[in-house]
Amino acid sequence: MGQEQGTPWIQSTGHISTQKGEDGQKTPKLEHRNSTQLMGHYQKTMNQVVMPKQIVY
């Protein structure tokens, strides 16, 4: 699937674009996964921080 679509891109831009596209596809996939985990961690931390802050107040 990706190779068929990459064929015209390679002829149009060059193999450099193909490498960049592959790298870009890998980066967002990892970032998306990290973003979700980070968000969950952030929410947990925020909840823990907000709870004691409210009690202190």
From Swiss-Prot:
Keyword entries, A-Z: Host cytoplasm, Host nucleus
Biased composition (Polar residues): 1-19
Transmembrane portions of the chain: none
Biological process annotations from GO: symbiont-mediated suppression of host cytoplasmic pattern recognition receptor signaling pathway via inhibition of MAVS activity
Broad class of the protein's primary localization: host cell
Localization (cell): Host nucleus; Host cytoplasm, Host cytosol
InterPro entries referenced in this protein's UniProt entry, alphabetically: Flu_proapoptotic_PB1-F2
Region annotation (Disordered) ranges: 1-35
UniProt biased composition (Basic and acidic residues): 20-34
GO cellular component, one term: host cell nucleus
HAMAP family, per database record: INFV_PB1F2
Function: May play an important role in promoting lung pathology in both primary viral infection and secondary bacterial infection.
Additional record remark: Is not encoded in all strains, and seems to be dispensable for replication.
Family named by the database record: Belongs to the influenza viruses PB1-F2 family.
Name of this protein: Protein PB1-F2
Species: Influenza A virus (strain A/Chile/1/1983 H1N1)
Gene designation per UniProt: PB1
